[in-house]
A protein has these predicted regions:
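An acidic/histidine-cluster motif and surrounding catalytic segment
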Residues: 1-35, 39-157
Length: 157
């Protein structure tokens, strides 16, 4: 968690909120769809998605990315890690894997969800969810510069 882009305590707190939902998903043995506060649904999300364990629903919210080549569920293509953890769906088996790995090490949630650690990560395209953030409680200025919504009115709280 110690990196130049985020404030340590806030970043850990955000990760733990996701971790808590992963734990609930695993314990309840139910599929979960997780949204962060800035997630806006811009297109229909199919009730049934033929994904394996963890599937991003969110359009990349920072930096450069690659568009998946086909519509529907694809291997994670936009980046090597989730392009923001603002919207994703997971099955209990995926939640269990995320929890087990977090016992070994953890990082900011989006970069924690990385293909090198979790090769079955997928994403749904076209992305039905976008992050429309106007503030952050997690990032430092360095972490905001690549955000697509970052401008002079963006607040670092």
């Amino acid at each position: 968690f110690r990196e130049i882009y985020s404030r340590y305590d806030n970043c850990v707190a955000a990760f733990m909120s996701h971790f808590t939902l992963w734990s609930m998903c695993a314990e309840q043995k139910e599929e979960f769809t997780i949204f962060e506060h800035d997630a806006i649904i811009v297109n229909d999300i199919p009730e049934y998605l033929p994904y394996k364990e963890v599937c991003s629903l969110g359009k990349p919210s920072y930096g450069k990315w690659n568009d998946p080549k086909t519509f529907g569920v694809n291997p994670l293509t936009s980046k090597r890690y989730f392009p923001g953890a603002h919207a994703y769906r997971l099955r209990p088996t995926g939640a269990e894997k995320l929890i087990e790995q977090a016992k070994i090490y953890a990082k900011p949630t989006d970069v924690y969800l990385h293909l090198d650690t979790f090769p079955l990560l997928q994403e749904y395209y076209p992305w039905p969810v976008e992050a429309r953030d106007t503030f952050t409680t997690i990032q430092k200025t360095e972490g905001c510069l690549a955000k697509h919504n970052y401008n002079e009115e963006y607040k670092i709280i």
